[in-house]
Amino acid sequence: HGVEFYPAGRGIGHQIMVEEGFAWPGTLVVASDSHSNTYGAVASVGTPIVRTDAASIWATGKTWWQIPPVAKVTFTGILPPGVTGKDVIVALCGLFDKDDVLNHAIEFTGSEETMRSLPMDSRLTIANMTTEWGALSGLFPMDGVLKGWLKGKATTAAMGLADGPFKTLAARNFTHPAIEQLFVNPLTADKGAKYAKELFLDLS
């Protein structure tokens, strides 16, 4: 059936989903673990499901998701050297600690300059820990930072330098034509999109 099987010892599940290109920008990805929000770092709406829902997906190939309220989190300023994504999400959890985003989908945004100061490792950490903040998902934009990371993966894969036991998989999923096609019509919020709430954090 074309199922890729990763036995015990092959790596952390969420890391594999990102590193091997299963969590792909512009897609919805579900998994039976509360930190499936991690995939939002690569502009994939990742959200957890319970194991019975996972079983029904195996049986039917279908699932459902009740669309949650959306909270827009706007970053301003520039992340200083030595400050990490963990610092950012811990600050968000501490500053907005009254169930502000409980069961919300979060959309992270900011100016090009601001978002450029948030590298992929920081985005992965922030998206991962939106679970601790009470959110159902945490989505970062399809921007230059993501594109640069994807192109780096594609170049590494094309050169046969991908790490791990699944080199061929990385090469198949990460290609320059596929990445260029993604950014022809990138995932963006509709003009005039309305949000349940808007929060702001100065990274400086």
Model segments located where?
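Fe-S-dependent hydro-lyases/dehydratases of central metabolism
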Residues: 1-204
